[in-house]
């Protein structure tokens, strides 16, 4: 078995947008569950009104404006956590790119993009669908974007195994 070392930590979660905020919130027993704000839940058919949404996230702290526009929110969260982890590690620019790998866990990938583009198709027609539709939503794009950003040439993959995703990624 090969040795793997986790040298930095980053987090974007319903209780904090950094590892430090997340840890402090967990220690304090803070819940990240609250009313859904990401979409309208007023339809009587929508029985779920609560969720653990990420709050007050600003992707511009981690990505260029053009890259934000071409990426789904799940990928922006992954990039933010990766940037934080790299900063925490102190290794950025000081590591052999062949030894730097990226593993990202995503339960489903870019669902926001999928829903948005389906609505665009229905309301505006086929010609209005974004050329970035597929690259934005596929689950492995987050790992790919992170690998590109940090010039990682080691293993790069996305693990998509539902509730076991985080354990498999580690």
What residues fall within each predicted segment?
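Pocket-edge positions in alpha/beta enzyme catalytic cores
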Residues: 70, 161-162
